[in-house]
From Swiss-Prot:
Identification of the protein by name: Succinyl-diaminopimelate desuccinylase
Job of this protein: Catalyzes the hydrolysis of N-succinyl-L,L-diaminopimelic acid (SDAP), forming succinate and LL-2,6-diaminopimelate (DAP), an intermediate involved in the bacterial biosynthesis of lysine and meso-diaminopimelic acid, an essential component of bacterial cell walls.
Gene Ontology biological process terms from the UniProt entry: diaminopimelate biosynthetic process; L-arginine biosynthetic process; lysine biosynthetic process via diaminopimelate
Disulfide bonds, paired cysteine numbers: none
Gene name for this UniProt entry: dapE
Length: 377
């Protein structure tokens, strides 16, 4: 049995070693298909990152498929059962780096749009693609830069599906209609270095910071809401000391991270942290990194269209969740866009032997096409 159009394109994309921020010709392959459909292509290169914006139509609403062609490194090749860049089907599963995250989705998007335009050449509104090779990297020169460019010329995305692997057990069982925000703090508590035998003429920043850190970990930041769990505070990194057993360190460095709901704000969290540190009379420096703001699409045409499309294909409505890490959807949501994530099962993403069910790719293609039918036919 010959490969389907979706599987053929997926294999072609997966055979290209596009480890972030490399694209390895994936975007060129997609652009060729989109040009044939009448899309206008705008390639946007920012430093080491290749992006493209493709649009068909000039009317509202503007619907966008967003995704990335880059993949994470393979890890140890000896741990893979197959070559990660030679897509291989075993027992109905397609194995390759990027199969689930997210070249499989890209193939589904392209084929769904080809089918939709074939059936509805004079469709309503506008179709577009926002594709980057920087999602798995530092996310500095990718989607966020394209969004800035679009905003500068007032080209605003109304609705967007991000092809991130949202599903858990089977394709479409979960769609993400929002994501938590991420805020990182880099705290340096200052002490006075000295000999451990003379603590009275030194000041131990580890000891000084312990009460404040404990209080930070015990604080209830908010209660969450119907869509988000309560905001969480975690300390992923701590560093202090010289390595010697007889030296009180001069500084203690603590990195902490909030994953926060729409019930909290960056400014509110920052203010509460500063007040707590000051209450404990710490001498410190504190730098902040806003990794992303929370977003939520709890109503609107896109949510309805996606839920109905999944129900049509699966005979069951999806669960709406906001769990997991951040995605490029956070940048697009800043435009005021409705944003939904719908993609393959995420059980093997970033792991060795990453894979996706071949049948799931066909179902996902049908879901994407049905969304377009619901919105723009």
């Amino acid at each position: 049995m010959p490969d389907t159009p979706t599987l053929t394109l997926a294999k072609d994309l997966l055979s290209r070693q596009s480890v972030t921020p490399e694209d390895a010709g994936c975007q060129e392959l997609m652009i060729k298909r989109l040009k044939a459909l009448g899309f206008t292509i705008e390639i946007m290169v920012f430093e080491d990152t290749t992006n493209f914006w493709a649009r068909r139509g000039t009317e509202a609403p503007l619907f966008t498929f967003a995704g990335h062609t880059d993949v994470v490194p393979t890890g140890s090749l000896t741990q893979w059962n197959t070559d990660p860049f030679e897509p291989t089907i075993i027992d109905g599963m397609l194995y390759a780096r990027g199969a689930a995250d997210m070249k499989g989705s890209l193939a589904c998007m392209i084929v769904a749009v080809e089918r939709f335009i074939s059936e509805h050449p004079e469709h309503k509104g506008s179709l577009s693609f926002l594709i980057t090779s920087d999602e798995e990297g530092p996310f500095i020169n990718g989607t966020t830069r394209v969004v800035d460019t679009l905003k500068e010329r007032n080209e605003i995305i109304d609705m967007c599906i991000v092809g991130e692997p949202s599903s858990t057990q089977y394709v479409g069982d979960v769609v993400k209609n929002g994501r938590r925000g991420s805020l990182t703090g880099n705290l340096t508590v200052k002490g006075i270095q000295g000999h451990v035998a003379y603590p009275h003429i030194a000041r131990n920043p580890i000891h000084q910071s312990m009460a404040a850190l404990l209080e930070l970990t015990m604080t209830e930041w908010d209660l969450g809401n119907a869509y988000f769990p309560p905001t969480s505070f975690q300390i992923p990194n701590m560093n202090s000391g010289t390595g010697a057993s007889n030296v009180i360190p001069g500084t203690a460095e603590i990195m902490f991270n909030f994953r926060f709901s729409t019930e909290s704000t960056v400014e509110g969290l920052q203010q509460r942290v500063i007040e707590l540190l000051d209450k404990h009379n710490l001498e410190y420096d504190l730098d902040w990194i806003i990794n992303g703001l929370p977003f939520l699409t709890d109503t609107g045409d896109l949510l309805t269209a996606v839920v109905d499309a999944v129900a049509t294909v699966n005979q069951q409505k999806p669960e709406l969740l906001t769990t997991g890490g951040t995605s490029d959807g956070r940048f697009i949501a800043q435009m005021g866009s409705q944003v939904i994530e719908l993609g393959p099962v995420n059980a093997t993403i970033h792991k060795v032997n990453e894979c996706v069910k071949v049948d799931d790719l066909e179902k996902l293609t049908d879901m994407y096409q049905e969304v377009l039918n619901n919105l723009l036919a």
